[in-house]
């Protein structure tokens, strides 16, 4: 799809030998798409979005300059750039945030491949703790002068490096290093990776004053504070951490002309 004019690209279709008339109609994010009978009855489909676009909507980022960062298996930071495509000079992705009533809002996106999945690695592979939330207490009780650094590049590095061959490493280990110190280093690493994306957005001319966060990791209040300190930015927490589901519900309700008051 050509995001500049929100239509299928004849050039790409010809290159890939795809008949353009076989592709579906491009519609609003909230629209009448049809019905499904997957669950035994007719269910109306009235909203469609990618997961990060849904989270952008669920966090209420409807104005240019508003941004959200979702911390689940990975981390995905997305910035509403308004009605015009903004091409990044810092290797961020230009994409469509949503289209409502024929009006498109574009976005910049940066991805961190491993966030919550790195916490799971400490839990499952190194058996640091029996459940992921326990990393909070370990990190709180770490030696803040341990100088341990963690690079969680288990599956490469995302934005702005885009290096699929990069691999993880832990530096600064000594005989005094504890699992508490390594846990602290991991939370710091996720925050600093977020800062990489934040600085890319800043260099692209965006002056962020705050960042809305969501996802499973935001239950870790200690991580949220690390993030605020590293970014030197106001961090805004949602009433419901599942912003992606909230955004999908918003679009489905809007497309069905239902009340949005309880979403």
Per-region residue spans from a language model:
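A conserved helix-loop-beta module that forms one wall/lid of the active-site cleft
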Residues: 10-31
């Amino acid at each position: 799809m050509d995001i500049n004019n929100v239509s299928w690209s004849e050039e790409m279709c010809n290159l890939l030998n795809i008949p353009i008339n076989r592709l579906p109609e491009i519609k609003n994010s909230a629209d009448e798409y049809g019905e499904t009978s997957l669950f035994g009855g007719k269910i109306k489909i009235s909203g469609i979005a990618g997961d990060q676009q849904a989270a952008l909507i669920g966090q209420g980022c409807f104005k240019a300059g508003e941004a959200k960062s979702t911390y689940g298996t990975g981390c995905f930071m997305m910035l509403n750039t308004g009605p015009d495509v903004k091409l990044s000079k810092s290797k961020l992705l230009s994409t469509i945030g949503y289209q409502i009533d024929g009006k498109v809002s574009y976005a910049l996106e940066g991805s961190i491949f491993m966030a919550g999945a790195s916490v799971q690695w400490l839990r499952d592979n190194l058996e640091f703790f029996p459940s992921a939330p326990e990393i909070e207490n370990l990190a709180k009780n770490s030696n803040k002068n341990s100088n341990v650094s963690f690079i969680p590049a288990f599956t490469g590095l995302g934005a702005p490096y885009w290096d699929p061959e990069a691999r993880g490493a832990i530096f600064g280990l000594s005989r005094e290093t504890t699992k508490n110190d390594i846990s602290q280093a991991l939370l710091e690493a996720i925050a600093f990776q977020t800062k990489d994306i934040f600085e890319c957005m800043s260099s692209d001319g965006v002056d962020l004053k705050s960042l809305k966060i969501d996802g499973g990791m935001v239950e870790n209040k200690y991580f949220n504070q690390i993030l605020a300190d590293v970014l030197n930015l106001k961090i805004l927490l949602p009433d419901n951490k599942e912003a992606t589901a909230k955004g999908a519900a918003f679009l489905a309700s809007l497309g069905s002309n239902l009340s949005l008051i309880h979403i």
